[in-house]
From Swiss-Prot:
Gene3D superfamilies reported in the protein's UniProt record: Divalent-metal-dependent TIM barrel enzymes
EC code(s) of this entry: 3.1.21.2
Name of encoding gene: nfo
List of residues binding Zn(2+) 1: H69, H109, E145
Species: Prosthecochloris aestuarii (strain DSM 271 / SK 413)
Protein name: Probable endonuclease 4
Cofactor note: Binds 3 Zn(2+) ions.
Residues reported in the UniProt entry to bind Zn(2+) 3: H182, D229, H231
Length: 283
């Protein structure tokens, strides 16, 4: 079965996220575990944790279908020692928050060298950062998200993702989330069934589909290889409906969270329904 949802708000408490996902007809969802614009956050209360778990059970959401995202402030490849240490502490805290919620995945952007160090050095730093977080948490998989190739952000090629994974000590606790807009912006074609098959095959040969833990389903506002992260509603961008039909029908997408981050939350319910229709609606 395909598990399709969106990145929902935690306003009013993290326990509200499952209910918001259910309201839009989602069978998976993503969320932040705290205010993503702040470094620090109070610990999750026992009441919020219990309510979150109860609401997930009531709405039928399993841990493997929930894809929390870490703060955008974190840079696990920072060339600045103080900022790197701050990022590592924040990322470890996010892993521990996910663990406390009874979840098993944490999605994150790899990191940026800020044009102050080499690519290989930054990839090594990112891997070391992930290893530190894994050593200080339990049962949570760190899920690398591919990037668009914008600026000095790393993770926009399958080779870079593979280089990070190669250095992770516990490979049972590392995975990948493929963002379709980022893939397309980085130069991986997704417009036809043939292109989708070729891109998945290339990922499998370089990284391995066994690491795929989720996807972000976003159309692209700009054309192939733009190196710019500009999301568009499904079917309204340069990837188009044919591309998303091929993606949603690909066997690699079975039973992993497929998360919308498209720009109009008011139509998420319609986009979810449209994607299910593309898949043949096997709910």
């Amino acid at each position: 079965m395909r598990r399709i949802g969106a990145h929902v708000s935690i306003a009013g408490g993290i326990e509200n996220a499952p209910m918001r996902a259910r309201e839009i007809g989602a069978t998976a969802f993503a969320m932040f575990t705290k205010n993503q614009r702040q470094w620090n956050a109070p610990p999750l209360t026992t009441q919020s944790i219990d309510a979150f778990k109860n609401n997930c059970a009531e709405c039928g959401y399993h841990a493997r279908h929930i894809l929390p995202h870490d703060s955008y402030l974190i840079n696990l490849g920072s060339p600045d020692p103080a900022k790197l240490e701050r990022s590592r502490k924040a990322f470890t805290d996010e892993m521990q928050r996910v663990e406390a919620l009874g979840l098993s995945l944490l999605n994150f952007h790899p990191g940026s060298h800020l044009n102050e160090t080499g690519i290989d050095n930054c990839l090594n730093t990112i891997a070391e950062s992930v290893n530190i977080a894994l050593d200080n948490s339990s049962g949570v998989t760190a899920v690398l998200e591919n990037t668009a190739g914008q600026g000095s952000n790393l993770g926009h090629t399958f080779e870079q993702l593979a280089a990070i994974i190669d250095q992770i000590e516990d490979k049972t606790r590392v995975g990948v989330c493929l963002d379709t807009c980022h893939l397309f912006a980085a130069g991986y074609d997704l417009r036809t069934s043939e292109a989708v098959e070729a891109t998945f095959n290339e990922f499998d040969s370089i990284v391995s589909l066994s690491y795929l833990r989720g996807m972000h389903l976003n159309d692209a506002k700009l054309d192939l290889g733009s190196k710019r992260d500009r999301h568009e509603s499904i079917g309204s961008g340069f990837i188009g409906n044919d591309g998303f039909a091929a993606i949603i029908q690909h066997p690699a997408c079975d039973e992993i969270p497929l998360i919308l981050e498209t720009p109009n939350p008011d139509i998420w319910n319609r986009e979810i329904e449209m994607l299910y229709q593309m898949e043949g609606d096997k709910r």
